């Protein structure tokens, strides 16, 4: 990344044209000065990558897209990054469909809002190559209700709202199956849809809605499967959830949340530094506390994340 261009006021007035031997001297000095400036620009570009910005003091600004800007862990990570000369600028998105296109179009430098399965679906659907550069946590996907206090209280033919994006929808169906509320044909998979529900063998009916609207749907349904960030933003108490999947199990691998970059920036040292800072004790504790203790920290090598992503992309392509 090159430094921002200077304005016209920064260009010094040219002296009278020199004569004689001074011409060669001035030319040599000018060439040397240009060489130094070019070398500095190349160094800054190497350190900051193609999207972030470096100021005159060498501080780097990195734009990170998220859907949970209000989470209490962000100030902790932002302060820690600032100590390393990295100024994090958060860009909040109101739903899950916006942050990956924004990253691909270089409107932001990184994003942190999604798990690997969501990323796999995006890459396949959009023929994209966004890639994980660091893991963070796995959070449960839980069932909440304003009308019932236990799964057993949900009546036959009760209505359950679930997220309608493919990855969270499939996970929600698996959660409901684990809770004994429905059955999926063939046992279901990470790509299950409402069409896979065995209605004759199921107790409830599902209603897909936008993930951001699952909380708002609570008064009109028996229960809703709600993503952790939306549940916390709505001040729902995770301990009052009727049911949730177990983020510590191996089956949770597709749901590892990750920092994501463009493929060209996957080795950017500034971006990788931010991903590493997440696992410092103070930052990690803040993230887990922000989830009300529901999140499980995951620190997997990037090679593992790339392997899991490649496998999930293969599964998604096969389904299409």
Task: State each model region's role.
Residues 1-25, 51-57:
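Terminal targeting segments of Actinobacterial cell-envelope proteins
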Residues 45-63, 81-82, 151-157, 313-320:
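Immediate post-signal peptide segment of exported/extracytoplasmic ligand-binding proteins
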Residues 57-69, 86-92, 158-160:
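Short, well-ordered beta-strand elements
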Residues 59-62, 69-73, 221, 279-320:
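An extracytoplasmic/periplasmic, membrane-proximal ligand-sensing/linker region
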Residues 79-80, 92, 97-111, 174-175, ...:
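Short helices/loops that flank or line small-molecule/ion binding pockets
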Residues 133-183:
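A conserved helix-loop-strand patch within extracytoplasmic ligand-binding domains
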Residues 140-151, 255-273:
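A bilobed periplasmic-binding-protein/Venus flytrap-type ligand-binding module shared by bacterial periplasmic
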């Amino acid at each position: 990344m090159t430094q921002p261009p200077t304005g016209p006021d920064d260009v010094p007035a040219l002296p009278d044209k020199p004569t004689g031997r001074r011409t060669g001297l001035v030319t040599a000095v000018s060439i040397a000065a240009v060489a130094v400036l070019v070398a500095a620009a190349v160094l800054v570009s190497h350190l900051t990558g193609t999207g972030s910005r470096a100021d005159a003091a060498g501080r780097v600004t990195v734009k990170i897209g998220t859907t949970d800007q209000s989470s209490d862990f962000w100030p902790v990570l932002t302060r820690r990054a600032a100590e390393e000369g990295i100024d994090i600028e958060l860009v909040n998105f109101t739903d899950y469909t916006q942050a990956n296109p924004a990253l691909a179009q270089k409107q932001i430098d990184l994003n942190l809002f999604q798990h690997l399965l969501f990323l796999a679906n995006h890459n396949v659907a959009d023929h994209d190559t966004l890639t994980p550069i660091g893991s963070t946590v796995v959070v449960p996907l839980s069932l909440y209700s304003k009308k019932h206090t236990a799964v057993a209280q949900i009546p036959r033919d009760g209505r359950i709202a679930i997220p309608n994006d493919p990855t969270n929808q499939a996970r929600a169906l698996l959660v409901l199956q684990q809770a004994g509320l429905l059955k999926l044909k063939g046992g279901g998979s990470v790509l299950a849809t409402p069409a896979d529900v065995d209605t004759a063998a199921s107790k409830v009916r599902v209603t897909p809605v936008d993930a951001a609207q699952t909380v708002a749907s609570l008064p009109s349904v028996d229960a809703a499967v709600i993503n952790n960030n939306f549940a916390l933003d709505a001040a729902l108490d995770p301990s009052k959830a009727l049911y949730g999947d177990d983020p510590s199990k191996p089956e949770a691998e597709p749901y590892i949340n990750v920092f994501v970059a463009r493929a060209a920036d996957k080795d950017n040292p500034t971006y990788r530094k931010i991903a590493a800072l997440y696992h410092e004790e103070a930052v990690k504790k803040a993230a887990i506390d922000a989830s009300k203790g529901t999140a499980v920290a995951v620190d997997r090598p990037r090679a593992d994340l790339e392997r899991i992503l490649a496998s999930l992309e293969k599964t998604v392509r096969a389904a299409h």
